[in-house]
Swiss-Prot record:
Causes the migration of the distal retinal pigment into the proximal end of the pigment chromatophore cells and thus decreases the amount of light entering the retinulas. May also function as a neurotransmitter and/or neuromodulator. One of its GO terms (biological process) is chemical synaptic transmission. The modification Alanine amide is found at A18. One of its GO terms (cellular component) is synapse. Residues 6-9 are annotated as: Important for DRPH activity. It is found in: Secreted. The keyword Secreted applies. Belongs to the arthropod PDH family. It comes from Leptuca pugilator (Atlantic sand fiddler crab). GO terms for molecular function: hormone activity. Its main location: secreted. This is Pigment-dispersing hormone. Keywords: Amidation, Hormone, Neurotransmitter, Secreted. Coiled coil: none annotated. The lineage of its organism: Eukaryota, Metazoa, Ecdysozoa, Arthropoda, Crustacea.
Length: 18
């Protein structure tokens, strides 16, 4: 569960960081 939420919330962060 934590990984799934982290993946969804981390997706825009990675795109923004890139």
């Amino acid at each position: 569960n934590s990984e799934l939420i982290n993946s969804i919330l981390g997706l825009p962060k990675v795109m923004n960081d890139a």
